[in-house]
Amino acid sequence: MNLEIVAQLTVLALIVVSGPLVIALLAVRKGNL
């Protein structure tokens, strides 16, 4: 595999994972407030 492909897959995975994480974080903060 090329380094570019690995980098793109890593960035894509980070975006896919960070989406729900940010939503969950906001939900938890609102719940605590």
Swiss-Prot record:
<keyword id="KW-1133">Transmembrane helix</keyword>
<comment type="function">
    <text>A core subunit of photosystem II (PSII), probably helps stabilize the reaction center.</text>
</comment>
<keyword id="KW-0812">Transmembrane</keyword>
<dbReference type="Pfam" id="PF05969">
    <property type="entry name" value="PSII_Ycf12"/>
</dbReference>
<dbReference type="InterPro" id="IPR010284">
    <property type="entry name" value="PSII_Ycf12_core-subunit"/>
</dbReference>
<keyword id="KW-0602">Photosynthesis</keyword>
<protein>
    <recommendedName>
        <fullName>Photosystem II reaction center protein Psb30</fullName>
    </recommendedName>
</protein>
<comment type="similarity">
    <text>Belongs to the Psb30/Ycf12 family.</text>
</comment>
<keyword id="KW-0934">Plastid</keyword>
<keyword id="KW-0604">Photosystem II</keyword>
<dbReference type="GO" id="GO:0009523">
    <property type="term" value="C:photosystem II"/>
</dbReference>
<keyword id="KW-0793">Thylakoid</keyword>
<dbReference type="GO" id="GO:0015979">
    <property type="term" value="P:photosynthesis"/>
</dbReference>
<feature type="transmembrane region" description="Helical">
    <location>
        <begin position="5"/>
        <end position="25"/>
    </location>
</feature>
<comment type="subunit">
    <text>PSII is composed of 1 copy each of membrane proteins PsbA, PsbB, PsbC, PsbD, PsbE, PsbF, PsbH, PsbI, PsbJ, PsbK, PsbL, PsbM, PsbT, PsbX, PsbY, PsbZ, Psb30/Ycf12, peripheral proteins of the oxygen-evolving complex and a large number of cofactors. It forms dimeric complexes.</text>
</comment>
<keyword id="KW-0472">Membrane</keyword>
<dbReference type="GO" id="GO:0009535">
    <property type="term" value="C:chloroplast thylakoid membrane"/>
</dbReference>
<keyword id="KW-0150">Chloroplast</keyword>
